[in-house]
A protein has these predicted regions:
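Sec/Tat signal peptide C-region and signal peptidase I cleavage site
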Residues: 15-19
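Noncatalytic regulatory segments and standalone regulatory/sensor domains
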Residues: 186-246
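A mature extracytoplasmic/lumenal domain signature
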Residues: 68, 137-139, 165-167, 185, ...
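A generic secondary-structure signal marking the coil-to-beta-strand transition
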Residues: 60-62, 159, 227
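Cysteine-nucleophile protease catalytic domains, especially the papain-like/related folds used
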Residues: 22-141, 220, 232-245
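Bacterial N-terminal signal peptides
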Residues: 2-12
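Active-site-adjacent substructure of cysteine-protease-like catalytic cores
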Residues: 141-192
Length: 246
């Protein structure tokens, strides 16, 4: 248990000087309380280490979906194109994600830089590079169904969860945002968001009811609620999904 604690602690980020205060309802991951939640025996954190290895800061104000996608693809070891400036090494970046013909034909980088992405566009972009993606709009999820997705998804190493939510429902400033989810504590009913706007907010534990309200907000660009996507690597995408309450 001590070894596990040390390995998890070593992956904890240090928030940059000047990062915004954590909202009153949130618990910063790098606070003593946040670390305690992460290290609890019952906490589902199967995705945490892999995501932390590839934790990204979004390249511009609208690239939250792009940064989240890059984190997910790299953490799942999805085959990537060459990364400019890194010789023959291949990994996903916020630039080369748009050099793949299938993704480039789906959405243009210039448009995302202006407008960001809707839940549907996030789903389509990730699917365009070969992953298996399931999309859940907040309007179609009950609170218990969301809890089930968190319990199951964050206890398994072979999938990733990314949320599209309204910051205001979490007591944060701003509007629509996208970031990966990394852990779930069933005792306090809190989920860890690895916020890709690292210059603005820290990685934070929020309550599941708050996240549920945040993903049920309407995205005016699409006219539908926000929500979350669950991503699997290409090999797993062809396997039948495990039955559940959704």
């Amino acid at each position: 248990m001590a070894g596990l604690g040390l390995s998890l602690m070593a992956l904890t980020i240090v928030q940059p000087v000047g990062a915004a205060d954590t909202p009153a309802t949130g618990i910063a991951m790098d606070s003593p309380a946040g670390q305690k939640l992460l290290l609890k025996p019952r906490t589902r954190r199967a995705d945490y280490a892999a995501l932390m290895q590839w934790y990204e800061t979004q390249a511009n104000l609208a690239y939250c979906g792009v940064a989240s996608s890059v984190m997910v693809l790299n953490s799942l070891a999805v085959a990537a194109p060459k990364a400019e400036g890194y010789g023959t090494n291949r990994f996903w970046t916020q630039t080369n994600l748009f050099t793949v013909p299938t993704s480039r034909s789906f959405v243009e980088a210039s448009r995302v830089a202006r407008e960001g992405m809707t839940l549907e566009q996030l789903h389509g972009l990730l699917a365009s590079v070969g992953t298996g993606v399931r999309r859940y709009h907040g309007e179609s999820l009950s609170l218990e169904q969301l809890r089930w997705l968190l319990r199951r998804g964050l206890a398994e190493r072979d999938d990733r969860l990314v949320a599209n939510y309204d910051r205001r429902a979490l007591g944060q400033k701003g509007g629509g945002h996208i970031s990966p989810l990394a852990a779930y504590d069933p005792d306090q009913d809190r989920v860890l968001i690895l916020d890709v706007a690292r210059y603005r907010y820290p990685a934070v534990w929020v309550t599941t009811p708050d996240l549920w309200r945040a993903i049920r907000s309407v995205d005016t660009s699409s006219g539908r609620s926000r929500g979350l996507v669950i991503i699997e690597p290409p090999a797993a995408a062809t396997a039948p999904s495990q039955a559940g309450p959704i």
